[in-house]
Design a protein with these regions (language model features):
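Conserved glycine-rich cofactor-binding loop
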Residues: 6-7
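Conserved glycine-rich Rossmann-like NAD(P)H-binding loop of the short-chain dehydrogenase/reductase
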Residues: 20-35
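C-terminal helical subdomain
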Residues: 172, 192-229
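Active-site helix of classical SDR
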Residues: 110, 146
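Conserved NAD(P)H cofactor-binding loop of Rossmann-fold oxidoreductase domains
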Residues: 78-83
Length: 256
């Protein structure tokens, strides 16, 4: 099961699964998921694609129900949305959608699938967090907040499942800025970070996928992101917030 599989990291994760012979159940809120599914089928695996909004319980239930009668060996929970700009200037419907996609829908799906895995006594879960969770996200406050939650949640869930001797592993992939549709959809194309050089989603996906197969607890993709998280752990939050604001403030990009 792969969420957010129509493009970016999720698409590349699904490709890796297909290359290894996994049959796929993929979902995205973008109609491009159907075209993506055709690409996955080129690897000779069975692919079932759904378009659904995982910000809603109905969307999550639709995806979960489609998996009934199948053994789910791995859940790759990658779906997520960003949102740039000052918090007070954002439409709260947009704010709520980011929270409901990145947090509520994600953990609702994980709970449902992980219960089945625990009952069966095996399974692998890969959750896409972010290095953004280490930094107060000035001008992307809600998004960074959701990723701080997801990073923390992933570590805690892994510890719970280990304590229960469940044989279900949880891996948190924490990428940095990646060359996807994220910044366009988040309205951050005019920012310094939106216009910066980004990581290749195929490279990011490979790091996370291999970590999942190896049962690793967490992995930061890319050397510069590893350095950033190390520095962030010893830097005052106020300093981090100021630094983030300089990169994410609307109009901060060099093309403006």
């Amino acid at each position: 099961m792969v969420t957010g599989a129509s493009s970016g990291i999720g698409y590349e994760l699904a490709i890796l699964c297909a290359q290894d012979g996994f049959n796929l159940l993929v979902v995205a809120d973008d109609p491009k998921i159907e075209e993506a599914a055709k690409q996955f089928q080129n690897y000779g695996v069975e692919v079932h694609a759904l378009q659904a909004d995982l910000a809603t319980r109905e969307g999550v239930d639709k995806f979960y129900d489609a998996a009934q009668g199948r053994q789910v060996d791995a859940l790759l929970a990658n779906a997520g949305h960003g949102l740039g700009g000052g918090f007070l200037d954002q439409d709260f419907d947009d704010v709520r959608h980011v929270i409901d996609t990145n947090i509520t829908g994600t953990i609702y799906l994980i709970q449902k699938v992980a219960k089945d895995m625990r009952t069966r006594g095996e399974g692998r879960i890969l959750i896409t967090g972010s290095v953004a969770g280490f930094t107060p996200g000035t001008y992307s406050a809600v998004y960074n907040g959701t990723k701080a939650f997801i990073d923390s949640f992933s570590f805690a869930l892994r510890a719970e499942l280990e304590d229960q001797d469940s044989n279900v592993t949880v891996t948190c992939l924490m990428p940095g800025a990646t060359e996807t549709e994220f910044f366009e959809r988040a309205g951050m194309e005019d920012t310094k970070v939106g216009q910066s050089k980004k990581d290749d989603p195929a490279d990011v996906a490979k790091v996370g996928y291999e970590a999942m197969l190896n049962g690793e607890g967490d992995v930061v993709s890319g050397f510069k992101n590893k350095v950033m998280t190390t520095v962030a752990s010893v830097t005052p939050a106020g300093v981090l917030a100021d630094q983030h604001g300089k990169k994410a403030k609307p109009g901060s990009g060099r093309d403006q």
